[in-house]
Design a protein with these regions (language model features):
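Amphipathic terminal alpha-helices
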Residues: 281, 289-309
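Terminal hydrophobic/aromatic helix or amphipathic segment near a protein terminus
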Residues: 227-274, 307-309
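Substrate-binding strand-loop-helix patch
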Residues: 158, 186-193, 215-233, 242-250, ...
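Conserved Rossmann-fold NAD(P)-dependent oxidoreductase catalytic core, especially the SDR/UDP-sugar
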Residues: 83-129, 147
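Hydrophobic/small residue at the entry helix of a nucleotide-binding pocket
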Residues: 12
Length: 309
C-alpha cells in the first residue's frame, strides 16, 4: 500500500479517490472544506493547498492535481496553486499528474492530438499553458516528474459545463433550453470516471511521464444530439434547444461572473471541437465510457445533487 495524495474533491478528485481506494491504496484527499467520498482507505483533509501541501505529501508516491479555482479567479488563483504543486512534488519526490483541459491549444481545425502546439487565444488558455510549461520545465530539469491528462467538457455526476448548467436541467424539466453554441457542431464529451482512470494509469507508468495525454473519450456528439439523447434516457419530453446569441451571453456577464468568463471560450461550442484520444487508449488499454452511460450518471447527478463539498 502506497500513499496517493489528491488535491481537489470535485467530480474528478472524488472519482480518483474511489478508484485508488478500490485498488487497496492509501489515499489522502485534500480540499478547503475537507469533503469527499466517505469510503475505506480515503482520508479527508481540510487544507489550503497553496500553503499546506508539502506537509501533506510527505511520503507520497503520487500527487494528483484535480483542483481548480473559481472560473473568474483563474488569473489570481492558479499561479500560487501551481507553484505549490511543483514545490510539493519536488520535496516529496511524488510524481505530479495534473488534470488539464484543451484551452491551451486555442482554436484549431480538425481533431486535437497531443502533438498540437499550445497557441491559446484566451486568458484562461494562457493560464493553462503556463502551468504546463512550468511543470514540464521542472521535469526536464530533473526537479520533478510530471505529466498532464487533458479532457474535453465533462459528463458525470456533479459536473459543470454549458450542457449541464444551461441545457440539461431545462431539458429534464421539459422546458426550452438555450446555449451559446452551434447546436450541430461535433463536440467531444469526456466522462469523469475516464479522467480518473487515465490519471491513475499515467501515475503508475514512468514511460508516460514528461508529456500530455488525452483522456479516452467517446465519439463526438453535437449539443443538439446530446440533449435529445438525454431526454430519451430520462423519459422527458423531446428536447428543445436554441442557440443563445453572443450578445445575450455578454449581457448576462454583466451580472454573473461565470457567464462573463464563458464569453471568451465560446469558440469551443460554436465550431467543431473534437478530441483525438487514441494514444491513451493504445498505451493504457482504457476504452471510453459509452455516452449513454455517462449521460445516465449526469442525469442522476442533476436530479439528486450531492451535498456541498
Amino acid at each position: 500500500m502506497a500513499l496517493h495524495v489528491i488535491v481537489g474533491a470535485g467530480p474528478v478528485g472524488a472519482a480518483t479517490a474511489r478508484l485508488l481506494s478500490a485498488r487497496g491504496e492509501e489515499v489522502r484527499l485534500l480540499s478547503r472544506r475537507g469533503g469527499g467520498p466517505e469510503v475505506d482507505g480515503v482520508e479527508l483533509v481540510a487544507a489550503d493547498a497553496t500553503r499546506d501541501l508539502s506537509r501533506h505529501t510527505e511520503g507520497a508516491v503520487a500527487l494528483y492535481s484535480c483542483a481548480g479555482p473559481a472560473y473568474h479567479r483563474w488569473t489570481t488563483g492558479w499561479p500560487p496553486l501551481g507553484a505549490a504543486l511543483l514545490r510539493a512534488a519536488e520535496t516529496s519526490g511524488a510524481v505530479l499528474v495534473t488534470t488539464g483541459n484543451l484551452y491551451a491549444y486555442g482554436a484549431v481545425e480538425g481533431p486535437m492530438t497531443e502533438q498540437l502546439p499550445m497557441r491559446p487565444n484566451s486568458v484562461k488558455g494562457e493560464v493553462r499553458a503556463k502551468l504546463w510549461t512550468d511543470a514540464l520545465a521542472a521535469h526536464e530539469a530533473g526537479r520533478i516528474r510530471t505529466a498532464e491528462v487533458r479532457g474535453s467538457d465533462y459528463l458525470g455526476a456533479g459536473t459543470l459545463s454549458a450542457f449541464t448548467a444551461l441545457v440539461l436541467p431545462k431539458v429534464l424539466a421539459g422546458r426550452r433550453a438555450s446555449a451559446p453554441a452551434d447546436l450541430d457542431a461535433p463536440h467531444s464529451w469526456t466522462h469523469t470516471g475516464d479522467v480518473a482512470r487515465t490519471l491513475v494509469a499515467v501515475a503508475a507508468d514512468e514511460r508516460a511521464w514528461g508529456r500530455p495525454w488525452h483522456v479516452p473519450t467517446a465519439p463526438a456528439m453535437s449539443l443538439r444530439r446530446l440533449a435529445g439523447r438525454a431526454a430519451e434516457l430520462a423519459g422527458a419530453p423531446a428536447a428543445r434547444v436554441t442557440t443563445m446569441p453572443a450578445l445575450a451571453l455578454r449581457l448576462a456577464g454583466l451580472f454573473n461572473p461565470a457567464a462573463r468568463e464563458m464569453a471568451e471560450m465560446q469558440y469551443q461550442l460554436r465550431h467543431p471541437f473534437v478530441l483525438d484520444s487514441s494514444a491513451a487508449t493504445a498505451a493504457f488499454g482504457i476504452e471510453p465510457t459509452p455516452t449513454d452511460e455517462a449521460l445516465r450518471e449526469t442525469i442522476g447527478g442533476v436530479r439528486e445533487p450531492a451535498a456541498p463539498r
